[in-house]
Amino acid sequence: AIKKGVQNELLDEKLLQFDLARLGAALKPERDLQFDYLGLQTLYDRYFLHVRKTRIELPQAFFMRVAMGLALNEIDREARAIEFYEVLSTFDFMSSTPTLFNSGTLRSQLSSCYLTTVPDDLDGIYESIKENALLSKFAGGLGNDWTRVRALGSHIKGTNGESQGVVPFLKVVNDTAVAVNQGGKRKGAVCTYLESWHLDIEEFLELRKNTGDDRRRTHDMNTANWIPDLFMRRVMEKGEWTLFSPSSVPDLHDLFGADFERAYVAYEEKAKRGEIKPSKTVPATDMWRKMLSMLFE
């Protein structure tokens, strides 16, 4: 399987430097019996290497290939590979899916998740979407922080126009995750994050609804809303909550705790005096109800 994988440019040719006879002797074919039908079918469908849809691995060879990739840079690589194989093949430990997919391959991307912050400029936004596509291609899960991107109605100096906010870009992110699945083995996985004071938060909370304009819906993408303690106190006090565009409050996203609360309250006072636009004040309890209701959509 190793030689065939290298010949078909699926595996790193450095794997041929291992003592393959020693590793082959360490295989325990009887451990295949630990799998039930569903487990074997999942390995066959998603994990085994194949050449034009013909699988070139069996379960124990698969585990050894993963172990070899992990031991590639070890001093006594055969001994370490056998150790890794032992814990994998006995199910004492199981690596993450990207490691199982990619260990020992030409692109040994072994990490499960990548977290990024999207900048507030067009080049940066589309560079982030491109990075999403490339990471998803090799089975990386994605978490994107979109809080820095200016909200709907914010001024764009370069064009003297107004921003369309984060939602149209999130539709592109959603469709990119669908188009660039994880090596053809499973759906792309992406979650976008927004803070509760962002002016687009109300529409953001509705992204996964089954009703409304489908051009402003992201049915295949997860969403996450960061909630500060101050917001929850406003909910309990039945107070108001002010929404801002991050372009008007550029430092707010970097603050937390008491520093965040001081800055947020100061920005609220400025908004009341008309010194910050656009902004919006909503009842905190209404926002809280919307957050809760979207958990069940």
Segments (PLM) and residue ranges:
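Extended catalytic cores of very large enzyme megasubunits
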Residues: 1-297
